[in-house]
Amino acid sequence: MTDHAGLVDYAEQVLDGKVALGSSAPRTAALLARCALEEWLDERSASWSSGGYPYPSTVSKLIALGALEGDELASRARRLWSALSRAVHHHAYELQPSITEVRHLVKQVPPLWR
């Protein structure tokens, strides 16, 4: 199992309640899924992003992914990364994402690398 697949599995365990995190479980699972997506993106971009300064941001890697591997994959990855980021960085005046919402996002991560 790759590291990013392990992160997704752990996110699913958090959402299933196998890891007791209480009310922070949805945000924690979203963070784990976003980390998995970013690890996958780091692997995909390793050939063209290594050794340079400054290290490319996730947004710039997502843009380059579209140019190098096609708009469909890149747009799916961009939308998913943005949605996971919103789930992780919600504001005090917003409702926390529900387990159902985060589970839907987590399930969309593995198809990116399959």
PLM regions with names:
Residues 48-114:
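Long, charged low-complexity segments
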